[in-house]
């Protein structure tokens, strides 16, 4: 990784944002480009809810919320949810869908670093799903998430491992063969090995609690969580108590 870090206000890849801006209007189309996100969301939500001891009454931040799929589902569980994203169009879609659904979610367009400077230790749960591989400095995002969570609070990350298998499955398979996501969605060079993510976590008040893989079976066309972090994986961390 480039040792020259982007400034806090510019930890943004505008090409990445443009990708999602272009398809934002179809974020809630269950048969569109975001179909995989809709399909894995129950698994993500179940993992977050179980590992955090329930979301009801908790203050939750969803970093890189996009069109609000996870944010809305956490709000339905009784959480007070704030969604952060740097994409204007996805946030507009998220706001409109929440209004149509009668779900209250606060959506904010700013970086997680900017948010951390104003809202340190204010959240019971912070989620950062499929976002780290889309920013220039994922380490900075991890640090900001750690600053935002309350002592004893939970932080969840999900991303893609960087190896030949993940390139084959997430890029060649998902983008070109099965066409589950648009071509160019992923750049294998930006994928993150679990050891790298854990090393960034260790630089903060966060401590690893659990890690699991997210697996897709093309034969049965099903997703499941389980051992093995070769491709997609989720990490649960907890902030040290004061």
UniProtKB/Swiss-Prot annotation:
One term of GO molecular function: polyprenyldihydroxybenzoate methyltransferase activity
Gene: ubiG
Pfam families from the UniProt entry: Methyltransf_23 (PF13489)
Protein name: Ubiquinone biosynthesis O-methyltransferase
Pathway info: Cofactor biosynthesis; ubiquinone biosynthesis
Record key words, sorted: Methyltransferase, S-adenosyl-L-methionine, Transferase, Ubiquinone biosynthesis
Biological processes per GO annotation: methylation
Lineage of the species this protein comes from: Bacteria, Pseudomonadati, Pseudomonadota, Gammaproteobacteria, Enterobacterales
Catalyzed reactions per annotation: a 3-demethylubiquinol + S-adenosyl-L-methionine = a ubiquinol + S-adenosyl-L-homocysteine + H(+); a 3-(all-trans-polyprenyl)benzene-1,2-diol + S-adenosyl-L-methionine = a 2-methoxy-6-(all-trans-polyprenyl)phenol + S-adenosyl-L-homocysteine + H(+)
Similarity remark: Belongs to the methyltransferase superfamily. UbiG/COQ3 family.
EC number(s) reported in the record: 2.1.1.222, 2.1.1.64
Organism of this sequence: Salmonella typhi
Binding, S-adenosyl-L-methionine: 44, 64, 85, 129
CDD domains from the UniProt entry: AdoMet_MTases
Taxonomy, superkingdom: Bacteria
Top class in the EC scheme: transferase
Entry function: O-methyltransferase that catalyzes the 2 O-methylation steps in the ubiquinone biosynthetic pathway.
């Amino acid at each position: 990784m480039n040792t020259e870090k982007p400034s806090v206000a510019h930890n943004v890849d505008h090409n990445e944002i443009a990708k999602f801006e272009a398809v934002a209007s179809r974020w809630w189309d269950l048969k569109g480009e975001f179909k995989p996100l809709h399909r894995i969301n129950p698994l993500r939500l179940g993992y977050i809810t179980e590992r955090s001891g329930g979301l009801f009454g908790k203050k939750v931040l969803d970093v890189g919320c996009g069109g609000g799929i996870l944010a809305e589902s956490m709000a339905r569980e009784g959480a007070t949810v704030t969604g952060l994203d740097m994409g204007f169009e996805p946030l507009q879609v998220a706001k409109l869908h929440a209004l149509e659904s009668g779900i209250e979610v606060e959506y904010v367009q700013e970086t997680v670093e900017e948010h951390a400077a104003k809202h340190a230790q204010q959240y019971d749960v912070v989620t950062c799903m499929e976002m780290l591989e889309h920013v220039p400095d994922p380490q900075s995002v991890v640090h900001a998430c750690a600053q935002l969570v309350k002592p004893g609070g939970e932080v969840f990350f999900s991303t893609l491992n960087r190896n030949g298998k993940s390139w084959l499955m997430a890029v060649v398979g998902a983008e070109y063969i099965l066409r589950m996501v648009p071509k160019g969605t992923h750049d294998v060079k930006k994928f993150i090995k679990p050891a790298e993510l854990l090393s960034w976590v260790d630089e903060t008040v966060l401590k690893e609690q659990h890690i699991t893989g997210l697996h897709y079976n093309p034969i049965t066309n099903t997703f499941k969580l389980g051992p093995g972090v070769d491709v997609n994986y989720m990490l649960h961390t907890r902030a040290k108590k004061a």
